[in-house]
Amino acid sequence: MPPVRGEEPMRPNGQPMGTYKYWSPKAQATMVEHVRGLLKLYGDGMRRNADGKIIMQTMFEPIPKPSFDTEGKQKYLAWLEEKYGGDIKKLNSRYKLAAKSFSELKPEEYWLRLEELNWVGCARPTAEDFASRTPDFWRWIDNQTHLAGVLQDYLATMKKHWRELEPNLFIEPLLHQWGYFFNPPGQVDWQTGQRALDIYKCANHVDSVLFIAAPLNAENRADAMALSVEGAIMRNANLHRPFTAGLYLGRHVNGDIYRVVPPAECIGTHVANGAKGLHIYGYSGLDDGGVMFRMDDLFKDSLRAGNRWAANVIPLLTAPRVKEVAILFPAEISLYEPLEVDAEGRHRMDLLGWYQQFTDLGWHVDIVHRDQVAGGVLKDYKHLVIPTNSLYELGDNAALETAVKNFVRAGGNVFHGPHCELAKRALRIKEEQIAFDCIKWAEEIIPHGWSTVAFKGGKALGKYIQSGKTAIAQTTIGNGKVFSFGFQYGHSYSRCTMPIVPPHYGKREMHPVVLLAETPVAALAGTSPLLPMQPVKGVEFARFGNKLVIVNHCSSPVDIRGLKAKKEIAQVPAAPGWLAAHAAICLQIQEPNVN
């Protein structure tokens, strides 16, 4: 960041924090002057969009921090009093304090272990704090909620400043560099869960939401589908407007991920998600932040092939990407839950598994925010998936619940797992906790997950073998259906390990969801009606009118000889009618436009 910050937040000991005081007019003025200097320095040499807008990365990874000077303390305490409606007794109950007023609260009473604060990091609650809803949990929730508001207010204010400085400025700050929903495990300072960052809300105050992602899932495994999830988040945060997709290619220490998912495949994944531009990061540096220039020739050849293919294909994708399935983004988990609280990344893997399952069936999958659902976006979708969200009750979700209820009544379908508070509140789904057991389906299922429940209503589609209770239920509401799974279906589908058949079942043949001849979702949802060929697990399809982008995430070539195409643009050479492994192709198909 620029060395002149105007005004910095202060530590409790009176020392500067080492970053911007984002709400300070002085700090904001230094940012304006910095951008003014760049505009003057580069002049006509600056890159512009086709409409003449100047593309400007107005900020790199903003991280709001509190300030413990007089003004900063007053600001936070005023916010805290407003949040609690002036009810100090409610705050005392949560924080286990005996304060008589908000104004007398001390920093160590209202901020979580403030001695651990620095310009990038902070203290975080433990898993026990989350499980027991301790005072430290509530301090954390309040701290992060406040900082999220600071960031959004900052972006809104700076948008006005940028417009005054240069009306043709295209405002595209880089909001996060280490992935958004999937962060590198073990790198606690770079996780979204302590950044107070909700990019869907930030999107209201910028021209384009941008963050850098990588093909790395929550278990620290190279995974192209995790990158596809991040791309879907970018697309939907930007409301399907043209957007730039970030890709962190200078990554090596996380298992040398680009030896498993090559750059061309990553670029194809972003293009399939609708990206109109690429922000490639990590060419050179002193640590894992930039080692791309040291990569071998195979890596560079793949990058070159991906870039050339994208340059040819992106201009052809002028029609909107098809919308079919919506996954509800677990905003509360993303905002509040540190990685170390999410054991083995299983909450995030549950969303990934749902995304994989529907993508493997050829569906086009979007990831939508509760505010977007409340605003009416579900009218464009056939199915809604609700992944695990253990912090759902922390959100303001009344409008979301009404929208979901209306969606189902109008004919939409909902898929969800256990402990789904949204399904309980909006759809009156009732469940009871039961001991782990296997499920009688067309085949017998060993459920992967961390808890199992039985449902008390609806039609039983699958039953627990021992108790006979309902494991998979179908509930009809109006013209729509709710499909309830008594185990974490997405997490189960994302597994790459084989569970052991419970000993009391002897040598009976049982399998996890991912190894079934036909999964429950495949039986209930079927394949996308727009799919021009039989689905292939690990192959992603994206329709843009009469253009079809296919990305092969598998290690073997895929037979596409059955597709009738007027024109094709392949990333890498392959035998006629075949799509190479870990590569993409764009086809102009001989079918009417699909919008």
Segments (PLM) and residue ranges:
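Hydrophobic targeting/anchoring helices
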Residues: 8-16, 172-353, 461-463, 473, ...
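Polysaccharide-binding and catalytic clefts of secreted carbohydrate-active enzymes
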Residues: 4, 8-226
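A short, well-structured beta->alpha microelement
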Residues: 197-198, 356-377
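Conserved beta-strand positions
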Residues: 58-59, 211, 280, 367, ...
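A short helix->loop->beta-strand "cap" motif at the edges of active sites that frequently abuts
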Residues: 167-169, 238-241, 409-413, 480
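Mature N-terminal, pre-catalytic/accessory segment of carbohydrate-active enzymes
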Residues: 1, 13-49, 54-55, 161, ...
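A conserved amphipathic helix/loop scaffold
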Residues: 388-595
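Short acidic/histidine-rich motifs immediately flanking catalytic phosphotransfer sites
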Residues: 377-384
